[in-house]
C-alpha cells in the first residue's frame, strides 16, 4: 500500500512538473511572440505602437475573435481605446474606429494605405477582382464595373427585382410553416444576382445547388491560409472551382456575342466596357469578376434584408409610418396578380408599379433603410495595408501592418446624433434632422465604406431594401415563431443565430388586375 501511494505521488509529481514546464514554455512563447511584433515597429518614429495584445504564436487572437464575435472588438475598444493592435488570420492588425480616424484611412487610399484583405480572400477570389486591385488597375476596373450600376442599368433592374421580391414575399405568406428568413434571404439574393444582375440562365434546382456551393465559398473566405485537407481554405477552393465550372460555358457564350450590351446585362456591359478601354477580357477574368459581383450581393444583401424584417417587427410604429407614406403616394395597395416566372411584373394591365423615381419620393422608407444599415451594418469593417508609417490618434501605424477600420464600432460610438446611437430611430435621417452633418459628418455613417473604395453597388442595394420594405408592408404581416427574438451574431456577417423563424400572413386585398388573386 505504501509503495502504491508513493507511486501515485511520483506520478502526480511528474505530471505537475510536466504541466508547470508546459505552462512556462507557453508563457515564454507568448512573450517571444509579443516581442517579435514589438520589434517590428518603425524605429524612425518616436510614437509608440497602439496598445493591445498579439495573442498566441501563429494563431494570434483569431480564436478569441471567432468565439466572442462583436464582444471581442468592443471589449478591447473599452480597454485600449479607438485604435488598438491585435493579430488576426495570420497578420498583425491595427483596429481603428471613430469618424476622424476612419476618415484618415478612407481618404488615404493610394497615399497612406492600400486595400488589403486576408490572404485567404485573395486566394479564393482571385487576382482579377476589384477587391484585390490597387492603383491604376483598380481605377480601370472600377470604371468598367461602374456601368453595371449606372442609372440606366438600375432602371432596368428595379421592375425585375420587384417582381422577384413580390414572388418571394407571397411564397412566405403561402407557407404553412415558419420561414427561416436568413436562409430564404440568401437563396433569394443569389437568385436575383445570378439571374437578374448576371443574366445567367438557371433553373430552380441548379440555382439552389449553386447557391449552396457559393455559400460554402463565402463561409470560408475568412480562414487561416492553410491549404491542407479539411481546412476552411481547402473547402473554399473546392467550392470556387465548382462555380467556375458552371461559369465557363456562360462566360464563353457572352464573349462570342456581338450585339451591344443593353443596360441590365452585367457580363456584357463588363466585356464591352473593357473592350472600349482597349482590353480584351479573358474567361478567367470574367469568372472572377462574376464571382465577386455575387459575393458583393450575396451575404451582405441577405443580412441587411433579414435585419430590415427583424427591426420592422420590433418597431411596428415604423410599419405604420411606411403604410401612411405609401398611401400618400398612391402606392398603398399591391398588385395581386402573379408575377412571371422570370421575376418580372405580370402582364396584367395594372398601373405600372415602382421605379427609381418613385422610390426617390418615399422619404421615410429611405430613412428606415438607412437606419437599418446604421444599426446593423452587414459588414463589420474593411481591410487596408499601411504603405508607409503614419500617425493616427497619437500612435504609429507601421509600414506593412494591416489596418481594419470598423464600421460597426464607428456607428455605435458616433456622438453626432440627437437620439442615442443604440436606438432604432429612422427620423435621425429625416430632412429636418441635422444629424451626421457638418465637419466629418459623413464618416459617422459608413455602411458602404467611403473614399476611392466606396461600394459601387450601394444604390442597387438600397433599392433592393426599399423594394423589400414596400412589398412586405403592403402585402404581409409577420410574427415570431419562437418565444423570443434571436441573438444576433456579428462575425463575419451580421445574422440571427437561429435564422429568424417567422410566420408570414397575407394582408386582406381586393383584386387589382386580370391575374389570379393571391
Curated annotation (Swiss-Prot):
- Keywords associated with the record: Heme, Iron, Lipid metabolism, Membrane, Metal-binding, Monooxygenase, Oxidoreductase, Transmembrane, Transmembrane helix
Xref: Gene3D superfamilies: Cytochrome P450
Keyword Glycoprotein recorded: no
Residue positions annotated to bind heme are 455
Q: Where in the cell is it found?
A: Membrane
* Extent of the signal sequence: none
Instruction: Enumerate the Gene Ontology biological process terms.
Output: anterior/posterior pattern specification; central nervous system development; neural crest cell development; organelle fusion; retinoic acid catabolic process
Reaction catalysed by this enzyme? an organic molecule + reduced [NADPH--hemoprotein reductase] + O2 = an alcohol + oxidized [NADPH--hemoprotein reductase] + H2O + H(+); all-trans-retinoate + reduced [NADPH--hemoprotein reductase] + O2 = all-trans-4-hydroxyretinoate + oxidized [NADPH--hemoprotein reductase] + H2O + H(+); all-trans-4-hydroxyretinoate + reduced [NADPH--hemoprotein reductase] + O2 = all-trans-4-oxoretinoate + oxidized [NADPH--hemoprotein reductase] + 2 H2O + H(+); 9-cis-retinoate + reduced [NADPH--hemoprotein reductase] + O2 = 9-cis-4-hydroxyretinoate + oxidized [NADPH--hemoprotein reductase] + H2O + H(+)
Q: What is its EC number?
A: 1.14.14.1
Q: Which Pfam families match?
A: p450
Q: Which cofactor does it need?
A: heme
> Which InterPro entries does this chain map to?
Cyt_P450 (IPR001128), Cyt_P450_CS (IPR017972), Cyt_P450_E_grp-I (IPR002401), Cyt_P450_sf (IPR036396)
What GO MF annotations does this protein's record show? heme binding; iron ion binding; retinoic acid 4-hydroxylase activity; retinoic acid binding
Membrane topology category: Single-pass membrane protein
Q: What SUPFAM superfamilies does the record point to?
A: Cytochrome P450 (SSF48264)
Give the phenotype of cells or organisms lacking this gene.
The knockout presents no discernible embryological defects, however double homozygous mutants for Cyp26a1/c1 display a more severe RA embryopathy phenotype than either mutant alone, with lethality by E11.0. Among others, this includes CNS patterning abnormalities, a reduced size of the head, eye, frontonasal region and an open neural tube between the fore and hindbrain.
- Tell me the function of this protein: A cytochrome P450 monooxygenase involved in the metabolism of retinoates (RAs), the active metabolites of vitamin A, and critical signaling molecules in animals. RAs exist as at least four different isomers: all-trans-RA (atRA), 9-cis-RA, 13-cis-RA, and 9,13-dicis-RA, where atRA is considered to be the biologically active isomer, although 9-cis-RA and 13-cis-RA also have activity.
> What family does the database annotate?
Belongs to the cytochrome P450 family.
Matching PANTHER family: CYTOCHROME P450 26 (PTHR24286), CYTOCHROME P450 26C1 (PTHR24286:SF100)
Please state what the protein is called: Cytochrome P450 26C1
Q: Which organism is it from?
A: Mus musculus
